[in-house]
């Protein structure tokens, strides 16, 4: 019986209980709060990384945009930790589900757009019709700008889903090929196993980069509307 390549993306269930809830809540354990007066190396490294990322993301924002700092940092930690947990054996990655990513992207995008129309109504409407547009092109340009606006959350969610899913499928395929080649050619199996290790390391980087890209784009949407 052929194995379904997408079986690893099905939500695992034990005793009738879906594990996705525990997997989504578990990342908070990866970032513990130290009660010591002098932080250990892990907590110090964690704080340094958070300060570095927050400085890069919030440097473009004004005083109103700075109020979104906590939300953006929580978002990048949530996406990054769930992506990393999905690389563990027999685990499930929630960010491979388009429904979940749309559930994150649409409210964040809608909040940014509504904030822009409330605080900068004229500037927000001006995005639909750039200055100097020829009169015959005005109706078409307004339609194009409207479509591009509403496609932003879809592109945001699809980008994250596609990148995470593609990496997991490659790991699954190369891992299966390695197991199949072990009984045929040990040398070839070692080569594919080396490729598998390198690809896994690359996926760790992709998991963090995609969390950064998702949060950075949300930050840019907020910057355009605050």
UniProtKB/Swiss-Prot annotation:
It is found in: Mitochondrion inner membrane. The keyword Transmembrane helix applies. InterPro entries: ATP_synth_F0_asu (IPR000568), ATP_synth_F0_asu_AS (IPR023011), ATP_synth_F0_asu_bact/mt (IPR045083), F0_ATP_A_sf (IPR035908). PROSITE patterns: ATPASE_A. Keywords: ATP synthesis, CF(0), Hydrogen ion transport, Ion transport, Membrane, Mitochondrion, Mitochondrion inner membrane, Transmembrane, Transmembrane helix, Transport. GO terms for molecular function: proton channel activity; proton-transporting ATP synthase activity, rotational mechanism. It is a multi-pass membrane protein. It comes from the Eukaryota. It catalyses: H(+)(in) = H(+)(out). CDD domains: ATP-synt_Fo_a_6 (cd00310). Belongs to the ATPase A chain family. Component of the ATP synthase complex composed at least of ATP5F1A/subunit alpha, ATP5F1B/subunit beta, ATP5MC1/subunit c (homooctomer), MT-ATP6/subunit a, MT-ATP8/subunit 8, ATP5ME/subunit e, ATP5MF/subunit f, ATP5MG/subunit g, ATP5MK/subunit k, ATP5MJ/subunit j, ATP5F1C/subunit gamma, ATP5F1D/subunit delta, ATP5F1E/subunit epsilon, ATP5PF/subunit F6, ATP5PB/subunit b, ATP5PD/subunit d, ATP5PO/subunit OSCP. Subunit a, of the mitochondrial membrane ATP synthase complex (F(1)F(0) ATP synthase or Complex V) that produces ATP from ADP in the presence of a proton gradient across the membrane which is generated by electron transport complexes of the respiratory chain. ATP synthase complex consist of a soluble F(1) head domain - the catalytic core - and a membrane F(1) domain - the membrane proton channel. These two domains are linked by a central stalk rotating inside the F(1) region and a stationary peripheral stalk. This is ATP synthase F(0) complex subunit a. The lineage of its organism: Eukaryota, Metazoa, Chordata, Craniata, Vertebrata. The gene is MT-ATP6.
């Amino acid at each position: 019986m052929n194995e379904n390549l997408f079986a690893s993306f099905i939500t695992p269930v034990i005793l009738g209980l879906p594990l996705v809830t525990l997997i989504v809540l578990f990342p908070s354990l990866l970032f513990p709060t130290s009660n010591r007066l002098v932080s250990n190396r892990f907590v110090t490294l964690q704080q340094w990384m958070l300060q570095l990322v927050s400085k890069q993301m919030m440097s473009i924002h004004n005083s109103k945009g700075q109020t979104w700092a906590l939300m953006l940092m929580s978002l990048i930690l949530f996406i990054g930790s769930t992506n990393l947990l999905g690389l563990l054996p027999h685990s499930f990655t929630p960010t491979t589900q388009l429904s979940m990513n749309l559930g994150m992207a649409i409210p964040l995008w809608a909040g940014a757009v509504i904030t822009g129309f409330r605080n900068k109504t004229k500037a927000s409407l001006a995005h639909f019709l750039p200055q100097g547009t020829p009169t015959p092109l005005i109706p078409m340009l307004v339609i194009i700008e409207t479509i591009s606006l509403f496609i932003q959350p879809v592109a945001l969610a699809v980008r994250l889903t596609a990148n995470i899913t593609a990496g997991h499928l490659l790991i699954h395929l190369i891992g299966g090929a390695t197991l199949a080649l072990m009984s045929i050619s040990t040398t070839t199996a070692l080569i594919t196993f080396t490729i598998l290790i390198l690809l896994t390391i690359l996926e760790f980087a992709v998991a963090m980069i995609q969390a950064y890209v998702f949060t950075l784009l949300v930050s840019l949407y907020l910057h355009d509307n605050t």
